[in-house]
Amino acid sequence: MFVKTFCAAVNGLEVTTVTVEVSLTRGVLYHLTGLGDAAVKESHDRIAAALLNNGYKFPVADITANLSPADLKKEGSGFDLPLAIAILAVDGKMQADRLAEYMLVGELGLDGQLRPVKGALPIAIKARAEHFKGLIVPKANEHEAAVVDKLDVYGMNNILEVVNFLNGSSSSEPCVVDTRREFYARQYQFDLDFSDVRGQESVKRALEVAAAGGHNLIMIGPPGSGKSMMAKRLPSILPPLSLSESLETTQIHSIAGKIGKGEGLISQRPFRSPHHTISEVALVGGGQSPLPGEISLAHNGVLFADELPEFNKHTLEVLRQPLEDRQITISRAKYTVTYPCSFMFVASMNPCPCGYYGDPTHTCVCTPGQIQRYMNKISGPLLDRIDIQCEIAPVPFKDLSKAAPGETSGQIRERVIKARAIQTERFNEVKGVHCNAQMSERLIRQYAQPDSEGLNILRIAMERLKLSARAYNRILKVARTIADLEGSEQILSSHIAEAIGYRNLDRGDWAERGL
């Protein structure tokens, strides 16, 4: 006898339909072909125990199971369920009439319970594209997969429920998710708000400019000045995720196994804050299985690197290409995958090894040479990709106790959304450019030229402040964003002056002056 069931293999964001073919003849051997990894090859023992513990006997026969296409590597335990169902059907223990209508995915426990798998959302998208009537997944993956419309998704607890459903002896109902209502209901439900931050108005302004133009930003200041506190509130002032952005972001988190039970589409921009001990593989992705790293999990959101100089220098250097290309290609001997990673890079750091350089309330014990060596842990090419460099001084206690609550995140976000709308219209016909931070030199010449007074201020600043040549285009990009926030088509001298103030680390005398 011969039976087929259907499942899927996930490789990066690409999903391939896999046909599980099972043939039964006389004999006692079990053969599994189709380039499966160790987890797939071990499925025989899990399936045999699951069937036995649910009242079935594993067939005493020569069984050949093939995962087609045979040249595609199959990874993970999600093939357990389609293999088990095919074995039961080929042995005559269940009906095979409806197997072609459904895609199956799930790991089997020894007791027959279905355990969650990674990548349920992209698999559901593939099932719809292949015109399957429905998708059967573990109960824990049900909500995640059901965000895909025009596809019936059935969450099952164990293999017996799957058998009864496919035999037509149970009336399981597909999971129904009101995707749009859930998505929009949670968009603005932030736990953190900028109204919690007392003082630091200049830093809030820098973060608003960064959010409005999609600019990468670094904050330099002593411990306790509020760097991390403000960075964590940045997602609350960014433009809300669109449904298409959310779907792409959620797929990445699904592949990484980061979607919890009962969770659907990600409704807020991701905020990822890896520890400074993170490895290169954990940061950019890869490993034995090509899983997305932190930069891809931050796609369409924020990647925050706290205490930037404490990161391994080689680890930081791998950020350079993803920051430029907004995608990462991971190539290994057995696979090549590409993940998107378009994120805002936000970093914080102390100004010196002791942390108190320029702090009026503490004495810095570092020499200029020590400060310079500390700063040299961050390479020029990486700093070149950071548009805004913002210095932070601690808020004095008397000001902290008297300061009235500042603007809410919602008020700031309204201005950011208006500025982004201007940029969307400006770059409507420019492929791959959505905000000012992504402008090329040609686009800078076209859209970011200041008036004569502004150009003169920029020339003087370049000479007197010893600004590096790489700061020139960054200043113009940021000035363009400041003008957009004010609704000005022309970049004025005031916009240039503010943008110049955000290039502190490019000044040649940085280690010889106070904050």
Language-model-detected regions and their locations in the chain:
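Walker A/P-loop
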Residues: 219-260, 325
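Peripheral, non-AAA+ core regions of ATP-driven protein-machinery
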Residues: 1-218, 225, 331, 471-472, ...
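The Walker A (P-loop) glycine that initiates the GxxxxGKT/S ATP-binding motif of P-loop NTPases
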Residues: 221, 285, 307
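Walker B catalytic acidic pair
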Residues: 300, 306-307, 318
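Short beta-strand elements
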Residues: 18-24, 283, 387-390
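Basic, amphipathic alpha-helical bundle interface domains used for macromolecular binding and assembly
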Residues: 33, 39-44, 59, 66-76, ...
